[in-house]
Design a protein with these regions (language model features):
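Structured loops at beta-to-helix junctions and adjacent beta-edge loops in soluble globular domains
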Residues: 1, 7-9, 71-73, 109-111, ...
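Secondary-structure transition/capping motifs at alpha-helix termini
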Residues: 12-26, 51-64, 76-77, 98-99, ...
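Active/binding-pocket-proximal capping segment
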Residues: 72-75, 182-183
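Cys/His-rich finger/ribbon microdomains and the adjacent scaffold used
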Residues: 1-35, 44, 51-56, 62-67, ...
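Helix-rich, typically C-terminal accessory recognition domains appended to large enzymatic cores
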Residues: 44, 94-215
Length: 215
């Protein structure tokens, strides 16, 4: 596991670990996402192997990962790590049945900053479910109307793109969801006043939302 990322870029090469051409084109890894528990074993040895392979000329970089992000853990009640042995594992099946998988996906991102642990409480998923219903109604109510974009709509559209982009780039995933909620509320208010929202703004909203609620 200390050098698997090298084989990913050249896994059919039976002559060498990785071709220099492919290594130069695709490595080092841009972003490594993993739990902090890997820091003292896998990540440490990955650095050793990478530096060694660089020293002997197999690759031309001496650090395996450009950026590292350690995500937090979703815990059970009282902050206890979920495990089958403790009997505190939460099955998603009931939540998916009652609220849909998109609500569950977005709620998991919304519970807190991704780098921190968060205690699981499924009561909060109802708020995300209501938000998605509100957004769906906004899209359905406006999709067949020929609404001309107002300055206010264009402003919200541009602000939405900016907020989602900058928060994604900083891995502030919980605030990405809150930005969707905030701007959707603004668009709902505009729709009541203008009779709907223009198609470009709706399309932008749907495209930005797709990675978080694809269904």
């Amino acid at each position: 596991s200390s050098w698997y990322f090298l084989r990913y870029v050249d896994n059919h090469n039976n002559e060498e670990l990785v071709s220099r051409e492919k290594a130069d084109a695709m490595l080092p890894v841009d972003m490594y996402i993993g739990g902090v528990e890997h820091a003292v074993l896998h990540l440490l040895y990955s650095r050793f192997y990478t530096k060694f392979l660089c020293d002997i000329g197999v690759i031309d970089f001496d650090e395996p990962f450009v950026k590292l992000f350690n995500q937090g853990m979703i815990t059970g009640k009282n902050g206890i790590k979920m495990s089958k042995s403790k009997g505190n594992v939460v099955s998603p099946d009931d939540l998916v049945r009652d609220y849909g998988c998109d609500s569950l996906r977005m709620y998991e991102l919304f519970v807190g900053p991704p780098e921190l642990d968060a205690e699981w409480d499924d009561r909060g998923i109802d708020g995300v479910y209501r938000f998605l219903k509100k957004l769906w109604n906004l899209l359905m109510d406006s999709k067949d109307k020929d609404i001309k974009p107002t300055k206010e709509m264009i402003k919200v559209r541009h602000k939405l793109v900016y907020d989602i982009t900058t928060r994604l780039e900083s891995f502030s995933l919980n605030t990405v969801i809150s930005a969707f909620m905030e701007h959707t509320n603004t668009l709902v208010a505009i729709a009541k006043k203008e009779g709907g929202v223009d198609r470009d703004t709706l399309d932008t909203l749907a495209v930005l939302l797709a990675p978080f609620a694809p269904h």
